[in-house]
Amino acid sequence: MNIWLNMLTTTGLGAIIGGYTNHLAIKMLFRPHRPIYIGKFQVPFTPGLIPKRRDELAVQLGKMVVEHLLTPEGIGKKLTNEEFQKGLIHWAQVEVDKVIKNEQSLRHMLEKWNVAHVEEEVTQKIEYVITEKIQAFLAEYYTYTWEQALPHSVNEKVENAIPNVSAFILERGISFFESEEGKGRLSKMIDDFFASRGTLLNLVGMFLGNVSVVDRVQPEVIKFLGQDGTKQLLTDVLQKEWEKLKGRDVKELESFVEKEMIVSSVLSAVKVEETVSKFLNQSVQQVCEPVRETIIEKVVPSTVTKGLKWGTENVESILNNLHLAEIVQQEVSTFSTERLEDLVLSITKNELKMITYLGALLGGIIGLVQGLLLLFLR
């Protein structure tokens, strides 16, 4: 009976000592949190291993994350994974569609995003761009002649239209002189002419008798305007004037209309401020609805795919610029010792328990072996 009691005692003591030793060793990883002094003498193994080496642990964790966890190869594989890409595209389509279907006005949406004075800025920007474009256009075209500035098609149309313009002018002239107003104007012109010639009117009156001068001149004027020769003459005159105009510099226009006036006229016609205001007062849905399907089905997938491709090609540079090792190091360094202990224990709790149990098991086995040795030695 004493033999079995001795074996049980040695086994139990060995298990208790082995289990408690491992439990104490685990506790000493974290505790005490601060060094303990007896007078000026620091007690050995204080503070615990992890509190003592926390800064080194932070550095090593940062290196481990960068070198073994968040590697360019691992992230690159994830970004090129077909299922991941499909999921990301679907998520992006859903989120973009929510924005597109928003019934709030663009103005309200921009205010929510803290984008202030957008209307004034957009108006000024558009007016600035228009002004710059007009001035650049004028600066270029002022170096040309009209023949160089006008498109060839316009030149052809003008030249083809000259005979028609001549015919139109003559037709309007005939219609005018056939009217009472035209006859009156012609009569006044004749009277003014003879008034400046003195007795010439009396001499003409002797030849014409009772018929007025205007009645004789009016048919001749109309006849003259209706002749083909007159039409050709006017056409030739217009053609010569057109050729002269084509040879003149466009810059001559500046003496009649200043650049600032042209810019001001264009801006007034465009009504930029009014247009921008109307645009911003529209809802997001109204603005995007005409192109909604294109955005969802084409733009979003294309943008996501290109973004992932760019990310894959530049993942190493991105990770380097993020300085992940420093981020992890800084975060771990800010942890209190208690939080760091809780973090490690939450991950390794079961394993540490098993280490304690293993210590008890080994201690029990050693105690049992000791008991057996004592038995045989007796």
Curated annotation (Swiss-Prot):
GO cellular component terms, A-Z: plasma membrane
Disulphide connectivity of cysteines: none
Compartment(s) of residence: Cell membrane
Topology term for the membrane: Single-pass membrane protein
Chain ranges passing through the membrane: 357-377
Keyword Cytoplasm in record: no
Recorded coiled-coil stretches: none
Keywords, ordered alphabetically: Cell membrane, Membrane, Transmembrane, Transmembrane helix
Keyword Electron transport included in the entry's annotation: no
Classification via InterPro entries: DUF445, UCP032178
Xref: Pfam families: DUF445 (PF04286)
Similarity section: Belongs to the UPF0754 family.
Name by which UniProt lists this protein: UPF0754 membrane protein BCG9842_B4423
Organism (species): Bacillus cereus (strain G9842)
